[in-house]
Every structure is written in C-alpha cells, then in structure tokens.
Amino acid sequence: DMDSTLIQTEVIDELADLAGVGEQVRAITESAMNGEIDFKESFKKRMALLEGLSEEVLHNVAVNLPITKGAHRLMKALKYYGYKTAILSGGFTYFGNYLQKELGIDYVHANQLEIKDGKLTGNYIGDIVDGQKKAEFLQAIADKEGIHINQTIAVGDGANDLPMLNLAGLGIAFHAKPTVKENAATSISSLGL
C-alpha cells in the first residue's frame, strides 16, 4: 500500500486541501478506510471534487511526500536480497511512479488521474484499484515472478487492503484502522518500516 503506509499521508486529502475541498474529501476517505462505505463509490465522489486542480500542484505534492521512516532502508535491503517490490494502491499512479523512481520499486499499480490541458478533469482512466484489484495484482505479480502466493508479503492500513493482506503469505496491518487490525493476522502500530 502507498498512502498512510509507504508514505505518511493520504495524497487525495492533500490534493483536496489544495483544491479547497479538504474537509469533504477527508470525511469520505475516512469512511472508506474504515469500511463504512464502498471504496469505488467513495473514490468517484472524491475524484469529482478535485476537478480543475493544476498538474503543477501534483508535482509539488509528489516532491514533498513524507516517506515513512525506514522505507528507504527497507527497499534497499529487499533489493539487495533479490526481493521484488510493488506499490498496489487505491491512490494515484502519478505519486506511485514518483516513489518507484525514488525508492527503486519494481511494480506500481494504482489509479490513473485524467489530466487535460494541465488540469485534473475529476475523472480517472481505467479500472478503479480497490481491495479486490489489489489482491488480483498481488497474485499476478507472484505468477509473473514464478513464486507461490504464500511467498508474498503485503502491508497496508485500510479496509481496501484486507483482500490483499489476507491473500498474501504474510499480511501486515501497518498503523492500521481498527477494523483492519481486527481482521489481519499481523499488526504493527509502533514502529516505522
């Protein structure tokens, strides 16, 4: 997972603040992460509120992402030992791709923002990456890399991470919402990555 896991923010909330709709979007995000409303529906509502936001704002947010303590060291160690890494996120490819370059991550699967004339349209391109899609991407990567799903590790914090966490050989709820902690086999709440 990316938001509130690999980075210490929910990017969509940051974008919403800059678009002047922060409180509205934050309330929808919280409900979705707690499993109170469907992720896909919440995603569409939040996207619509971002219409007109400048691509320049996206760049400024990307270069200032607060990367979780220990993430650089963890990714370097995983790479050294030959592990493949991925961002499977209900967030945005724009930021996932930035982190991929920054941290040397192998795969990124997230939602693609639709940008026209340098501004967000309030729409997205392709399928919404929800919990089920994250699990499907995890399985596809395992298949591509020739490993059994039991040899995978997934880390996440929100309700939309549960399908992926439950599919992985080791699923870790990281600084997770209460419902996620209750439903994940392993939970970490006090350390960095």
Feature map (PLM): residue ranges:
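Active-site neighborhood of HAD-like aspartate-dependent phosphohydrolases
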Residues: 2-40, 44-45
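Charged/polar, solvent-exposed surface patches and flexible loops
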Residues: 14-17, 27-30, 45-48, 60-64, ...
